[in-house]
Swiss-Prot record:
<dbReference type="InterPro" id="IPR045849">
    <property type="entry name" value="IP5P_plant"/>
</dbReference>
<comment type="function">
    <text>Has phosphatase activity toward Ins(1,4,5)P3 and Ins(1,3,4,5)P4, but not toward Ins(1,4)P2, Ins(1)P. Seems to be involved in the abscisic acid (ABA) signaling pathway. Could also be able to hydrolyze PtdIns(4,5)P2 and PtdIns(3,4,5)P3.</text>
</comment>
<dbReference type="InterPro" id="IPR000300">
    <property type="entry name" value="IPPc"/>
</dbReference>
<dbReference type="GO" id="GO:0052659">
    <property type="term" value="F:inositol-1,3,4,5-tetrakisphosphate 5-phosphatase activity"/>
</dbReference>
<dbReference type="GO" id="GO:0004439">
    <property type="term" value="F:phosphatidylinositol-4,5-bisphosphate 5-phosphatase activity"/>
</dbReference>
<comment type="similarity">
    <text>Belongs to the inositol polyphosphate 5-phosphatase family.</text>
</comment>
<dbReference type="InterPro" id="IPR036691">
    <property type="entry name" value="Endo/exonu/phosph_ase_sf"/>
</dbReference>
<feature type="region of interest" description="Disordered">
    <location>
        <begin position="47"/>
        <end position="73"/>
    </location>
</feature>
<dbReference type="GO" id="GO:0046856">
    <property type="term" value="P:phosphatidylinositol dephosphorylation"/>
</dbReference>
<feature type="modified residue" description="Phosphoserine">
    <location>
        <position position="60"/>
    </location>
</feature>
<protein>
    <recommendedName>
        <fullName>Type I inositol polyphosphate 5-phosphatase 1</fullName>
        <ecNumber>3.1.3.56</ecNumber>
    </recommendedName>
</protein>
<dbReference type="GO" id="GO:0009845">
    <property type="term" value="P:seed germination"/>
</dbReference>
<dbReference type="GO" id="GO:0052658">
    <property type="term" value="F:inositol-1,4,5-trisphosphate 5-phosphatase activity"/>
</dbReference>
<dbReference type="GO" id="GO:0090351">
    <property type="term" value="P:seedling development"/>
</dbReference>
<dbReference type="GO" id="GO:0032957">
    <property type="term" value="P:inositol trisphosphate metabolic process"/>
</dbReference>
<keyword id="KW-0597">Phosphoprotein</keyword>
<feature type="compositionally biased region" description="Acidic residues">
    <location>
        <begin position="48"/>
        <end position="57"/>
    </location>
</feature>
Amino acid sequence: MAEVRSRSRRTESNWATICCSAFSCLQLYWARIVLRKWFNVSASESDYSADSDDDYEDRSQEFDPISSGVTNPRVDTDGNVIYRPKLRRRNSETFRMQYIDTKAIRICAGTWNVGGRVPSSDLDIDGWLDTLEPADIYVLGLQEIVPLNAGNIFGMEDDQPALEWENLIRDALNRVQPRKLKIKSHSDPPSPSKFKQPEEVPYSVEDMFVETSHDACDGISSMDNKLNSVESTDVPIVSEDSLTNIDVLGSTNDNASCLPIQEYLQRQFSTPNTPDRSLSMQINSDSKREERFSYTERVGLSWPEPPLRLLNQYVSERRGSFKSVNLTITNLRKPSYVRIVSKQMVGVFLTIWVRRNLRKHISNLCVSTVGVGIMGYIGNKGSVSVSMSIYQTPFCFLCTHLSSGEKDTDQEKRNDDVREIHRRTQFLPHSLNANELPRSICNHERIIWLGDLNYRINLSYEKTHELIARKEWQRLVEYDQLSREMTKGNLFEGWSEGTLDFAPTYKYEIDSENYIGDDPESGKRRPAWCDRIIWNGKGMKLFNYRRNEIKLSDHRPVTATFLAEVEVLSPRKLQHALTLTYAEIQGLDA
C-alpha cells in the first residue's frame, strides 16, 4: 500500500514539474515578445506576413550565383555552400539607357485612422480603393487599427482586427478586373513591321492563352491598312460541373477540332479559303483584308514558319481540349490581386497588394519599424516602412502615426518624430550581399509617405469653422502646419503633395457628418488635415488626391493615385548593346 502511495506521489510530482516547466517557458516566451515590442527589436527573420500561392513560382526569390554577382562557391565543414561576392567594376562602358525600357504602373495609396474600430463585413470601401480605376499596386496604411490602451501598447499584439481588414480589402479588390499595363519605350521606338502590334500585351504566358471575351480576338492589320474595329466574340464561361458534358473532340459545328494534327496545323498557319474560328479572315467589298488572330496564334507571327516547340501546344490548347478548359478554370479561380506584405506595429498597419502577374517582378522586399511613442521607442506612435524593387526601380512606402496635440510643443515633437524616423529607418541588405550598406529612406528612387501625421491648423476654432463653411481651402492651407514646414524647407525638403481642395479630415463625430463640438473632457477640437499622403522622386505623376466619405471613425480616409515610371531590363536591347561593345573592342584590338 505504501509503495502505491509513493508511486502516486512521484507521478503527481512529475506532472507538477512538467506543468511548472511549461508555464515557465510560456512566461519567458511572453516576456521575450513584450521586450521585443517595447524596444522595437526585430527578429532575425522577416516577421511580416504575405499571401502564399502554391501555383506561383516566385522567381525573384531564386538565387542565381551568376546573375546575383556571386561566384566561386566554397563549402564549409558542415557542407554548407559559402558564396563570395565577386568584384564589380565601377564604370561600365555600356550605358544604362542602352538596355533599359520604361514602363508606367498605376499606384493607389490610401491612409485611414480607423480609431480602433473593427469593420463590418458589408463596409463599402470601393471608393477609398478607387476600384472604378483599378491600380496595379495598392499601398494601404491604417492607424489605430487597435485601441491604444495599455494592454495593446505594452502587452501581446492583437492581430485579429488586421485579419478582418485584410479580408475586407481582399474582397473589394478581387471584385474588379485589373488593368493591363501599356509598354512604351521612349528610348527605343519600335521598328516598322508588317503587323501592327497591340499596345496592350499580356503579362504572362497563361494570360496570353486565356483572355476575356472582349480581348479574345484583336484586329491586326497590314501596314497599308488602318486597324478596323471588330465585334468581340462571346466566349461561354465553363464551369467545373459542366466538364462531363464537354465533347473533347468537338461538336459537329467545330470540324477543325476533329482534323488530324498535320491538317489542323496547315489550317492554322496558312491562308485557307474557309477560315477556322480561331483564325478568321474577313474580306470586305473594298478588297481590304484584315486578319484576326487570337493570342494563341499571335505567338506564331514572330516566326515565318510555325515554331516546332509550339506545335503540340497549339493542338493541345485548341477549343474543346481538356488542357484549355482546365487552364481556363484554374485562372478564373486565382485572385486578381495578392498581398505581398503586411506589417503591424501596435496600431500602425501597412499592407501592400499587387496584381497577381506583377508579383514575380517584385524583389528585394524588406521591412523596417521605428517606434517614437512612449519613452521615444514604444510603437504606439511611429512608422512601418517597406522597401522593394519593382522591376529594376527601388521603391519605399511608409505608414506613420505621429504625435498628437495642438500646442506649439506638439508641433515640434512631430517634427522630431519625422527626423527620428528618417534617421532610424534602415533596410538591411540580403545576407548574400553582406558587403552592401543598409539602405535608408532617401536611398530609394520613388518614395510615398502616408499616414496620420497629426499636423494641425494654426487658427482659432471659430475662424477655422468659418473658412470651412465658405470652402476657402486655399486660405486654410496657408495656416496648415505641414504646408508651412515644407514651404520653409524645415521638413520634407524636396517632397511634394497634392492640392488640398477638400475639407479637413479630422475630427468628426462617430457615424456623423458633423465635426466634433464642445467636449467637456477634451474641450474644443479644431478641424485639421491630419491624414496626408506625400511623395518624393522623379517619374511620378499624381492623378488625384481626395478624401472619402466613410463615417466609421473620427477621421476620413484619404486616397492618392499615382502613375509611376519603372525601369525594365530589355534583354533584346542588352544583347544589342553588348554586340556593339564587343565589335568596338575587336576593332581596337585589330
